[in-house]
Amino acid sequence: MQNLNDPKIIVALDFPSQNPALALADQLDPAKCRLKVGKELFTRSGPDLVKALQSRGFDIFLDLKFHDIPNTTSAAVAAAAELGVWMVNVHASGGEKMMVACRERLESFGNDRPLLIAVTVLTSMSDEDLAGIGIASSAEAHVSRLATLTKNSGLDGVVCSAQEAPRLKAEQGSDFQLITPGIRPLTADKGDQQRIMTPTDALKAGSDYLVIGRPITQAPDPLAALESIHAEVVAV
């Protein structure tokens, strides 16, 4: 059974602006999910949206995938920490110096620091896509390489597909957090995610948190959809 005080579902607020995002949030239960704010929504609506969601009781995963020189990226994750988000991410391909700088910058926040997660291989990318940018290894092998770099840099975990989860748990240890997008109940459309898995299967594979978007946000009754998936998740 899952810890009910640590919701495993992260609902992706993939909306173009604040009003529909808040309207959806008002239909959800912060005891059963956290919320992910990504690039489009944050660029348009900014920190005020994050604060509005936090005022409704939600923990926020700020999904901006920072990737820049160490000083710039570490300043960005510090700004996220000042905003009080629960989780923030960077691109592992930014390298060890960048990731270490981010981790060190967050140490001053103590127990209030957000989880610092790295992005490995985007779930929309196939082996052919990786080959197109000069990476000859498979997506799975490249994820493992970047996950090892992430752990060696002292970060909390990685974003990865559920298919890589068993291997990453074996390689990196049970405390290394795995955040998995591409989660779809069997009845949902595959969308643009190439590597997908059901919530139950993902948790059993080793995923710690599940990012779920359209199956909840575009459901006729988002709360009912959330509660259905939540019931499935807590039973694992």
UniProtKB/Swiss-Prot annotation:
Q: What pathway is it annotated to? A: Pyrimidine metabolism; UMP biosynthesis via de novo pathway; UMP from orotate: step 2/2
Q: What is its EC number?
A: 4.1.1.23
Cellular component (GO) terms are: cytosol
Which UniProt key words apply to this protein? Answer: Decarboxylase, Lyase, Pyrimidine biosynthesis
User: Pfam family example for this protein?
Assistant: OMPdecase
Determine the domain of life of the protein's source. Bacteria
Query: Which PROSITE patterns does its entry note?
Result: OMPDECASE (PS00156)
Binding locations of substrate = 14, 36, 63-72, 123, 184, 193, 213-214
GO molecular function list:
orotidine-5'-phosphate decarboxylase activity
The keyword Lyase appears for this protein: yes
**GO biological process terms on file:** 'de novo' pyrimidine nucleobase biosynthetic process; 'de novo' UMP biosynthetic process
Give the catalytic activity.
Answer: orotidine 5'-phosphate + H(+) = UMP + CO2
* Active site, renumbered: 65
Which SMART domains did the record assign? OMPdecase (SM00934)
Q: Which CDD domains match?
A: OMP_decarboxylase_like
InterPro entries per record: Aldolase_TIM, OMPdecase, OMPdecase_AS, OMPdecase_bac, OMPdeCOase_dom, RibuloseP-bd_barrel
PANTHER family, alphabetized? OROTIDINE 5'-PHOSPHATE DECARBOXYLASE
Question: Any idea what job this protein has?
Answer: Catalyzes the decarboxylation of orotidine 5'-monophosphate (OMP) to uridine 5'-monophosphate (UMP).
Family classification: Belongs to the OMP decarboxylase family. Type 1 subfamily.
Subunit comment: Homodimer.
Supply the name of the protein.
Orotidine 5'-phosphate decarboxylase
Q: Which organism is it from?
A: Marinobacter nauticus (strain ATCC 700491 / DSM 11845 / VT8)
